[in-house]
Amino acid sequence: SPRSLKADFLLSLCELVVGGRDGLQPIEKTVIDRCVRQVYREMALGLETGKTPLLQDLYEELLRQPEPEAKRIATALELYCTGSLNLFNHPTNVNLNSRVVCFVLKGMGENLRKIAMHITNDFVTSAVGNNFKNGVATWCYFDEFHILLRDPLTASYFVTVWKMLRKQGCVPSALTQNVKDLLASREIENILDNTDFMILLSQAQSDRAILAKQIGISEHQLSYITQSNSGAVSYTHLRAHETC
């Protein structure tokens, strides 16, 4: 159900914010789930007003719970609700039903970037699912892909995109100008295994050697990405399989 999916999303969000090395404990997960159900139950009673729950609503519901674990979770979320990183604790002013939606994470600090990526990933998953039900394909473009793969949680998500979401009509494309960092990711092999279309522009010598070893490019093929005009950029483009 939509409520279960949202509960799962918020559990993983709290895991990112609160969990630490050991992750959320069973009691903490139970408390979060209870609060999510309560928040969405209250929202259901006011559907005509168009009210959408915010992270603030979960924060306040946690403060009303008797368990000390709830207090711990609420304290961790405070930074993102009433603290200096409360950017996402507001109703969106973006038309998310537009045919083209662009998320720009440039300039965000590391802590806020992780939260932003998690929220963006949830939106992509929901959009792909909704479009698939309506028989519509979803084209997703991920720029500066080597940066997105630095976070293990986000990297794992992109493996899911390349393996699973494409079966729901998602056509993901990744772009990067840093081949070394891209191929250093632990998850890149899984992504490359599910990619059958690549565009390679001119590459530095060290990058050409890495590409030749990693994806089996011949010397003759490498000759096409050896020379470039003055001012030209090095660019790599990956696209997942478009068919199951």
Where do the PLM segments sit?
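Conserved beta-strand segments of the P-loop GTPase G domain that flank and frequently precede/overlap
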Residues: V104, L175-T176, L201-S202
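Short acidic loop-to-helix transition motifs that present clustered carboxylates
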Residues: V179-L182, S206
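A short helix-turn-beta junction within AAA+ P-loop NTPase domains corresponding to the substrate/partner-engaging
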Residues: E189-L200
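P-loop NTPase motor domains
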Residues: S1-C170, L183-R186, Y224, V233-L238, ...
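Conserved small helical "lid"/interfacial subdomain of P-loop NTPases
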Residues: Q214-I215
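Conserved AAA+ ATPase core "coupling" helix
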Residues: D207-L211
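Conserved H-loop
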Residues: C170, L175-N178
